[in-house]
């Protein structure tokens, strides 16, 4: 049994490593990657891509430690960091070889990973109570409004301030749902203490951690700085926000999953 578990884990790591190597080679094939020592934005892309890889392996391997009802949540956490890691390989290539902001790759990443993060709220509540599907769809609607608004502004399809306002409205809608809406009420009424604690921490990440993204948008597009300074500020702020929000979300899910699993064994 032990050898089977070890073999399974090694297979996961091996498969992930092979896929990662292929992705890295494909990203590097589009240009010669030369990372300069004073390119702090490029350095942040490399550091964060590696942190996301490590997080992915961790979340997938830790699935064996938790009960069945938490495995899906940990799998989603691993998928979030996996998808982000793959996109970061391409984004860092775009930045290092061209010096331009990888807007399209970043928003493709967000259009996949941010809805997955919102699904985590639904999954963590579904593990302990019956949750109406309306909660899921309201979180998805808020997420799409937020992301589409941001993209239309950054891609030049809409006035920057108008797009900023639309994105902020989507974010506010999400905050309402997790602080005062049905998701918040289910958490307060039916969740055990450990789940309530995790839910509360997750929603403060969405409040404080996600507030970093509007700062990146503001310093990247709305301050009137030089194109170089604006691009540097935008990408460093976005990169740090991605690291904090995606990895921290997964670690919170992992902590409550392990805690609830161990409590059930006693």
Question: What are these language model-derived features?
Answer:
Residues 1-29:
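N-terminal secretory/membrane targeting signals
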Residues 23-106, 119-266:
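Polytopic alpha-helical membrane-helix bundles and their juxtamembrane interface segments
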């Amino acid at each position: 049994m032990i050898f089977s578990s070890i073999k399974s884990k090694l297979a996961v790591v091996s498969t992930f490593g092979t896929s990662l190597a292929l992705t890295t080679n494909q990203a590097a094939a589009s240009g010669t990657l030369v990372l300069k020592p004073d390119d702090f934005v490029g350095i942040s892309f490399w550091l964060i891509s590696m942190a996301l890889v490590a997080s992915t392996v961790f979340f997938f391997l830790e699935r064996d430690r938790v009960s069945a009802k938490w495995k899906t949540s940990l799998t989603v956490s691993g998928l979030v960091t996996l998808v982000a890691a793959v996109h970061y390989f391409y984004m860092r290539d775009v930045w290092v070889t061209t010096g331009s902001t990888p807007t399209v790759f970043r928003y493709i990443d967000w259009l996949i990973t941010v809805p997955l993060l919102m699904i985590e709220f639904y999954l963590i509540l579904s593990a302990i109570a019956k949750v109406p599907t309306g909660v899921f769809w309201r979180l998805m609607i808020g997420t799409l409004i937020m992301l589409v608004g941001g993209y239309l502004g950054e891609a030049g399809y809409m006035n920057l301030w108008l797009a900023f306002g639309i994105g902020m409205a989507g974010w506010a809608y999400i905050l309402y749902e997790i602080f005062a809406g049905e998701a918040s009420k289910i958490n307060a009424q039916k969740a055990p203490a450990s789940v309530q604690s995790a839910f509360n921490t997750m929603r403060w990440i969405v409040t404080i951690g996600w507030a970093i993204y509007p700062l990146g948008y503001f310093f990247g597009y709305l301050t009137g700085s030089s194109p170089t300074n604006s691009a540097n500020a935008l990408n460093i702020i976005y990169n740090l926000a991605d690291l904090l929000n995606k990895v921290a979300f997964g670690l919170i899910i992992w902590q409550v999953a392990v805690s609830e699993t161990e409590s059930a064994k006693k």
